[in-house]
Amino acid sequence: MNIYIGVEISVRELDSSLLLATLAASKGHQVIVSDLESITKGISSGLLAPGIFHAKSLTPADHKIARHQAMIDKGFMITSIDEEGGLDIAGYEDFSKGRYSEKTISQSSAVFAWGPEDVETLKRVYSRHSKKIYKTGSPRADLWKSLFFKYWGKPKSAPTKPFLLVSSNMGLANNTNPFFKVLKSKKISGYYERDPELFKRDMGRVGEDFLRTYA
């Protein structure tokens, strides 16, 4: 089987995508890991033979739905596991409705989930498609296992005594993009149309993030 794994943010996704690709290749599959634009061009031009396109998310934006449909029309199958996971959000209900839809799941041959909370919520919210939703875990989480300690190595500056790590990544306050661009991107992608309360939550979150970051 030909498998194409799309990578959007290499620092976040490349290692886990290569792990997935290595395991698939060991089973005899032909795997390409590349940026989305290159894969899309290869498929539209007919250069890449039909197979599985493994997407980083099933966000129901119009352009993504159209892209996946074009792939399906050329004989490709769509699979996905959401790279973002929703681990920093209490509950999974809002995430399941903002990052998925009946249409994007119906286009997919398989939807993989990080753990019990997301798979149970997805199966309940999208009960018509419950048989194609699987609890597999994420290859990103697999890389946290002790098996890969040597792969990551230990920084020379790492403390020798027990320590508490406090993440300084406040996703909205110190994002690489200004907050207004984040809002614009979400609006274009239809997040606020699908979940009218999300705009209020984002405004609340960015206020809290700025307080934590610059207090």
What are these language model-derived features?
Residues L147-A215:
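Conserved catalytic-core segment of nucleotide-activated headgroup transferases in glycan assembly
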Residues N2-K154, V166-N174:
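Active-site and donor-binding regions of nucleotide-sugar-utilizing enzymes
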